[in-house]
Swiss-Prot record:
Polar residues bias spans: 1-10
Protein's name in the database: Uncharacterized protein HI_0896
Disulfide cysteine pairs (residue numbers): none
Similarity annotation: To E.coli FtsN repeat regions.
Pfam families: SPOR
Source lineage: Bacteria, Pseudomonadati, Pseudomonadota, Gammaproteobacteria, Pasteurellales
InterPro entries: Cell_div_SPOR-domain, SPOR-like_dom, SPOR-like_sf
Record domain SPOR: where: 131-204
Region (Disordered): 1-20, 70-99
GO MF entries: peptidoglycan binding
Gene3D superfamilies: Sporulation related repeat
């Protein structure tokens, strides 16, 4: 039984692949070796290739797609250039605005500094004027240990119309004429006192 099956298998012919269709193979081979010109003239394509209507439509669609891709690429490049130009213009404008803000800030600081300096000067002038207004002047006409001598000089000065006073400090009795708002008034009184004695102008 086993020998019969083996003989039957040997009797069957080996499997042979069918021959490839000659017509289809020739068409594919022709397409593989054929140079396909792609230009803008469908008539040229038809003349050189002798394509079927379906193949011609495919090639025309490829050309259209390529044109559309080129146009899209050109538009993208143009848009990129415009964006770069706008960005550069905005950057330049921002720099100008920043410089203007800096100049404005420096100007404001300078004005504030000038105002502060002016206020300081005014305050200094007021202080000087206040010091001048608060300072009094007088005459020192003599200093005596003897009270009677001081009173004698006081009386003679009063006779000239001066407000002579005696100020006692320890053992000294000082005869002074006071007080005057300005140094000029004290100098005038000094001239009047010369008929009695020499006095010196002092601050009080």
């Amino acid at each position: 039984m086993q020998q019969a099956i083996t003989q039957q298998e040997k009797a069957q012919p080996k499997s042979v692949l069918p021959n490839r269709p000659e017509e289809v193979w020739s068409y594919i081979k022709a397409l593989e070796t054929r140079t396909v010109p792609v230009d803008n003239n469908p008539a040229s394509v038809e003349q050189n290739m002798r394509l079927t209507e379906e193949q011609r439509q495919v090639l025309i669609q490829i050309e259209r797609d390529q044109k559309a891709a080129d146009e899209a690429r050109k538009l993208a490049e143009q848009q990129r250039i415009e964006d770069a130009t706008r960005t550069q213009s905005k950057t330049t404008e921002d720099m100008k605005n920043t410089e203007a803000e800096i100049v404005k800030s420096e100007s404001i600081k300078k004005q504030d500094s000038q105002k502060i300096e002016s206020a300081k000067k005014v305050e200094q002038i007021k202080t000087v004027n206040n010091v001048r207004d608060s300072k009094k002047f007088g005459l020192q006409c003599g200093a005596f240990k003897n009270r009677a001598q001081a009173e004698n000089l006081q009386g003679r000065l009063q006779m000239t119309g001066l407000n002579a006073q005696i100020q006692t400090n320890g053992e000294w009795n000082r005869v002074r004429v006071a007080s005057f708002d300005t140094r000029e008034l004290a100098v005038q009184a000094q001239s009047r006192a010369k008929t009695v004695t020499d006095c010196v102008v002092i601050g009080m």
